[in-house]
Amino acid sequence: MKSMNIAASSELVSRLSSHRRVVALGDTDFTDVAAVVITAADSRSGILALLKRTGFHLPVFLYSEHAVELPAGVTAVINGNEQQWLELESAACQYEENLLPPFYDTLTQYVEMANSTFACPGHQHGAFFKKHPAGRHFYDFFGENVFRADMCNADVKLGDLLIHEGSAKDAQKFAAKVFHADKTYFVLNGTSAANKVVTNALLTRGDLVLFDRNNHKSNHHGALIQAGATPVYLEASRNPFGFIGGIDAHCFNEEYLRQQIRDVAPEKAELPRSFRLAIIQLGTYDGTVYNARQVIDTVGHLCDYILFDSAWVGYEQFIPMMADSSPLLLELNENDPGIFVTQSVHKQQAGFSQTSQIHKKDNHIRGQARFCPHKRLNNAFMLHASTSPFYPLFAALDVNAKIHEGESGRRLWAECVELGIESRKAILARCKLFRPFIPPVVDGKLWQDYPTSVLASDRRFFSFEPGAKWHGFEGYAADQYFVDPCKLLLTTPGINAETGEYSDFGVPATILAHYLRENGIVPEKCDLNSILFLLTPAESHEKLAQLVEMLAQFEQHIEDDSPLAEVLPSVYNKYPVRYRDYTLRQLCQEMHDLYVSFDVKDLQKAMFRQQSFPSVVMNPQDAHSAYIRGEVELVRIRDAEGRIAAEGALPYPPGVLCVVPGEVWGGAVQRYFLALEEGVNLLPGFSPELQGVYSETDADGMKRLYGYVLK
C-alpha cells in the first residue's frame, strides 16, 4: 500500500523529517494521513476537537521546543530529535497497519504478492483482455487493481466465502459487531438474494407468513413461490401524491390477525405463535420508517421470527433520532421473536452495486425449537451464492463496516442529515411548485424557521401525525411512522393537499424527472406527483445546490410555458410528430388529465387496501408451477378479468407486486394497468418499466398489455 501522508501545521511542514509526504492541516480532510503534528497554538484552536470528531483515531503529536503539558487527545510531545521522528514514523506505521478491515487487508496483501496463476478467472489478472484492442480499452478503463483482485477461490489465503472461514469470516464478524448483530452474512447478488436466503431458511409449504403487502417482489419469490408458504397480507397505505406508506395500525391488533388466520388456515388460528415468519419493510422506498420496537411489542409474540427488509435503510442506528427504528439495537428476551435484517448496502451505504448483508439477531432464543441455526441458514445461503464470487464486492462490504465503525459512522450520517435539512430549506426558499415532504408547521412555527441542529435531533419534525393533511396517509397511529431524513422527497403540483383531490392543473413528476436527466441530474424514482432523491454521506453542498437550481429553472419553464423542444429535447426529437408545437404546460396538462380520467391515485391506493386485494384462489407456488409447465395462455389485460394470474405483475420501480401468482385479475389492479396502457399510447417517451405484463404492438399500431393467465 502506498504510504499515507503526515499532516502538520503549515509552519512545520518544511521542518518535519520523514520519507512521507507532509501536507498542511488545511490541505487535507484527514482521510489520506497516518499522523498529525500540531503546535501548541493549534491545540488551542479547536483542531483536537475536529480530529476527534472525524472518528479516525489518528495519532497526534504536539511539536514544541519547550516542555509543555500533554493535552488530552495528543499522543506525545516531540521537539525534533531523531528518536522522536522514529516515534512519529512508528505511530504512522501502526495506524496504517490497523486501518484496513480484515478481508480487504488480506486482499490487498495478496494482490501485492503477484502470484502466477493457472486457475480461474481466465483473464489472468487482465492479461487476456490486453491481447485485443477492445480488451485493452476495457482494461485501461477500469484499471489494473480490479483485474488483479478478481481471483479464484482455489487459493485458500483469502478464506472461504461460502463456508465462512479465514479473513472472510473475520470480516463478517467485524460487520456484526459494528451493526450490533449476532451474526452477519455478506451477500453478493443483492438484497433480492438476501431475502430469499432468509425466507428459504425459515419457511416451508404450509407455514404461515405475515406479509407486508408493500414487500419487494424478492420476498414473494422467496417466501411464496420458492418456499410455498401461505401469506396473511397486511394492508398498507398510499397517499394521493403516489408515495408508498406503511401498514395500517389496526393490522397489528392480535384479534384482527387471528381472524385473518381463520380465513386462510383455521387450524393455526389459536396457536401461541401462528406465524413462522413476519416480513416487514423497515423503511419503504419512499421513506416511511417503522418503529421496530412497536412492531415487536404488538406482533412479535405471534411470530417465530421477523424479517425486517431494510433494503432502503440500514443506516438508522447511526442517526440518534432514528435509533428507535433499528431492530438491531433492541434489547430482546426469550419471549421475543428472532430477528433478521437484510440491508442493501449499495443503496445508501458504501458498497458496489449488488452488495447486501444479512444480520441475524436471535441468540436470545437459542435452544428453542424455533431457533434457526447457522448451518441451516448457510444451507440456504449456498443455494443462492455463486461459487465464483467477485472479491471486490466482498471487500466493499468489509470496508463499509469499517467506515461505519464508531464515531466515524455517526459523524458521516449526522452531516448527511444536516445537509438534507439545509437543502429542504433552500427548496422552500427558492421554489413555489415543488415542496419538500415534511410537516409544514410544527408547534405553530414553520418547519424551516427552526435551527438545523434542532431539526436534525428531534424526530417530531419528521413524524407523521395521524390525520394531518400534509401527508395524506390514512390509518396511522401516533409515533408509528416518520419520514426518513435521508430521503429527499418532493411533491409536484396536481394534488390539493387539504382535500386529497386533483387540482385543475398538475405537473406529473415523470416530466420533472425527464428534465433533470436532460440536465445531468438523476433522481432515484418518481411516481404520479412525487419524486425521490437519495441522500448519503457522499453528497456535497455544491451538488445539492445544483439540484435546487435545476428545480427553480424548471419552475421558470412552467411559468413561461416554454416550448417542449427546448425543455425536453430528447423526447421531442424522438417523437417530433406527436409533440410538434407542444409547450411544457400542454404536456403537463395532458398527462395530468390522463391521471384524472382514470383516477390513478385512487387506483394505486386501492390495490394495497384489503377490501380491494385481488381474490386468492391458488397458492402462489402452485400457480407458478402451472406457468413453468406451460399450462397458461397470454391474454390482453383488458380481457383478463376473472382469470388467474400466472405471473406477478408490477411497475418498476418500486418493484412491489400489484397482483401475485394465484390471484385473480380484475378490479383496481386491472384498471391500473389499463391506465398505464393508455399512457403508453397517448404519451410516448414516458412509458414505465413493467414486469410480469408484456407490451406488444397490435396490427393497428397500438401498444397493448398482455399477461399470462392459467388455462
Where are these regions (language model features)?
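A short linear hydrophobic-aromatic micro-motif
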Residues: 184-185, 342, 520-524
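Conserved N-terminal alpha-helix of the aminotransferase class I/II PLP-enzyme fold
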Residues: 144-193
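Conserved acidic residues
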Residues: 31-36, 73-82, 182, 207, ...
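Short amphipathic alpha-helical segments embedded in low-complexity Lys/Glu-rich regions
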Residues: 190-193, 238-241, 530-532, 567-568
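Non-catalytic terminal extensions of PLP-dependent enzymes
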Residues: 2-4, 12-19, 28-40, 45, ...
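Short strand->helix junction
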Residues: 23, 192, 285-286, 540
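Short active-site oxyanion
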Residues: 2-4, 182-184, 206-209
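Conserved PLP-enzyme active-site core in the AAT-like
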Residues: 39, 48-52, 56-57, 193-204, ...
